[in-house]
Amino acid sequence: MLLGDILYHGPRNDLPDEYAPKQVLAMLNERRERLFCVRGNCDTEVDQMVLTFPILADYSIFLAGSRLIYATHGHVYNTAHLPPLCPGAILLRDILLHGHTHVPAWEPFGENNLYLNPGSVSIPKNGSAHGYMTLEDGVFEWKTLSGGVYHTLTL
């Protein structure tokens, strides 16, 4: 699951020296059958033209065990502005998964809900590592690019 801003991260951040969107799109296009993506605030129809998998969905909903995961970029829906999953609130025991802030997070909110953020592979913020998050068999792991695990959360 890619949480948006796939090829570009907007004008507020300097381009990293390693910025190579053509290499990123080639790598991702090769893996298109295994990717689910949501649109970030910097993703455009022009980006979609060069990618061979859909990236413009505003959100994705899927299950992890008994938990419903609402995955979105985070610039529209977040813990301050919850997504419209049920009248008045998100469902009991749901997970709100988003990027946007580039800061890893694993925080409870509401009644039995979780907010999770994988951080950022390309432009981490607040002193966090270049990293990502995996989900296997009900276990979330936050990892550095070298593969080291720095946080684990079991559902």
Whereabouts are the PLM-identified features?
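Short, surface-exposed, charge-dense and proline/glycine-enriched linear segments
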Residues: L28, R32-F36, R67-N78, S128-M133
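Active-site neighborhood of phospho(di)ester-bond hydrolases with catalytic His/Asp-centered motifs
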Residues: M1-D5, L35-N41, Y70-H73, D94-H100, ...
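Conserved beta-sheet core of the metallophosphoesterase superfamily
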Residues: H75-L153
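Short acidic/glycine-rich loop or secondary-structure boundary segments that cap or lie
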Residues: H9-R12, E45-Q48, Y70, N78-H81, ...
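Residue-level detection of beta-strand-connecting loop/turn positions
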Residues: G65-S66, E111
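Short low-complexity stretches enriched in small and charged residues
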Residues: K22-E30, L51-F53, A71-H73, G88-H100
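Core catalytic region of metal-dependent phosphoesterases/phosphodiesterases
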Residues: M1-A64
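Solvent-exposed, flexible loop/coil residues
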Residues: Y59-S60, S66, K125, T154
